[in-house]
A protein has these predicted regions:
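Short loop/edge segments at beta-strand edges and connector loops
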Residues: 86, 172-174
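Conserved active-site carboxylates
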Residues: 177
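Long, positively charged amphipathic alpha-helical accessory segments at protein N-termini or as interdomain linkers
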Residues: 1-29, 38, 42, 143-170, ...
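N-terminal lobe of the biotin/lipoate ligase/transferase fold
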Residues: 2-161, 193, 236
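Structural motif
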Residues: 81-82, 106-108, 133, 171, ...
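A short, compositionally biased micro-patch
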Residues: 50, 128, 173, 298-299
Length: 323
């Protein structure tokens, strides 16, 4: 309902729109409209009000609010339901709890900051307030658990396609890091809940460094992390970029369900910087175990095929560094 109010205010531009008009559109009282406007103001919207004239939107906050993100989103699955958190330890944790209690497929959990964001191999993920897009999406795909890695690759392609829309060239390092000049911009963590032969739900967590300056990164990350604004030369609208990512996720998830993985795999290969390179692979199950070889292909399941000691070895999970 607040999304509709914001949309009406934005469509009115510099004109005021009466409380009566808003009430009629929504089928509620003018008092209820006033209460919604007050809540929007609490969320950071600057809304002017004038007796006998109504309301006018003067400024919208740079926050990842559903009332902002869902305007013009027009997705079929992803982002129809959104859970907004000003601050949370981990969006994946919240999303898993919501999924366990029956949240709809496509539900998004998004936060302004994460205080305990996690990456692969239980690493911390730097997620400062208002500087990036930290979110998780709940999926309930009708696939076997062995096919779950395809969703990680799909998510990487979705973010890469969104970057293309903003004229930023993406580079994907298997399985799910998006890089620029050897520095990480995007991380993806996929967590599966289910049985041996059936997936109950999958939570795909995505962290995107949007408007973080080099100086704002912790010193230990400055040489290995980057942000979209650093590449672009100016700050990006987090709302617009997030909306673009959700649209790409929606399109690719539907494509995966209806047409399979082949074309998504082709697009992943187009963006990849791993194949043909010498790599070091760290096992997801035992970080003390690693091996080196040459990344030669991705198989149909999304596993990285590495030539090592004269044999081909398929890697389904782990961490890869390019040598």
């Amino acid at each position: 309902m607040r999304k509709t109010i914001v949309e009406m205010l934005k469509n009115a531009g510099e004109d005021f729109i009466s409380g009566e008009s808003i009430a009629g559109k929504l089928g509620i009282s003018r008092t209820a409209v006033w209460k919604h406007v007050q809540k929007l103001r609490e969320n950071g919207y600057e809304i002017l009000s004038r007796e006998r004239r109504g309301y006018k939107l003067k400024d919208a906050p740079d926050l990842l609010l559903p009332s902002e993100i869902q305007i013009g989103l027009d997705t079929k699955i992803i982002g129809k339901e959104m859970d907004y958190q000003p601050s949370v330890d981990s969006t994946n944790r919240v999303a898993k709890a919501l999924a366990y209690h029956g949240a709809a497929e496509g539900t998004i959990v998004v936060a302004e900051e994460q205080t305990g964001g996690k990456g692969r191999l239980d690493r911390n993920f730097f997620s400062p307030r208002g500087k990036g897009i930290w979110f998780s999406v709940i999926l309930r795909p009708k696939i076997l658990p062995k096919d779950a890695p395809k969703l990680t690759l799909m998510a990487a392609v979705a973010v890469a396609e969104a970057m293309n829309r903003f004229n930023i060239k993406p580079e994907i390092k298997w399985p799910n890091d998006i890089m620029f000049d050897g520095r990480k911009i995007v991380g993806i963590l996929t967590e599966i809940t289910g049985e041996i032969a059936k997936i109950s739900y999958i939570v795909v967590g995505i962290g995107i460094n949007v408007n973080i300056s080099r100086e704002e990164f912790p010193e230990e990350l400055r040489d290995i992390a980057a942000s979209l604004s650093e590449i672009n030369g100016e700050e990006l609208s987090r709302v617009e970029f997030f909306r673009a990512v959700l649209k790409e996720l929606d399109n690719l998830y539907i494509e995966l369900s209806e047409a399979g993985f082949d074309k998504i795999l082709e697009r992943w290969k187009k963006y990849n910087i791993t194949l043909g390179k010498n790599v070091r692979v760290i096992s997801a199950s035992d970080v003390e175990k690693s091996f080196t070889g040459k990344a030669v292909d991705l198989n149909h399941d999304g596993a990285l095929v590495v030539e090592t000691e004269g044999k081909l070895r398929a890697v389904y999970a782990g961490d890869v560094s390019i040598r």
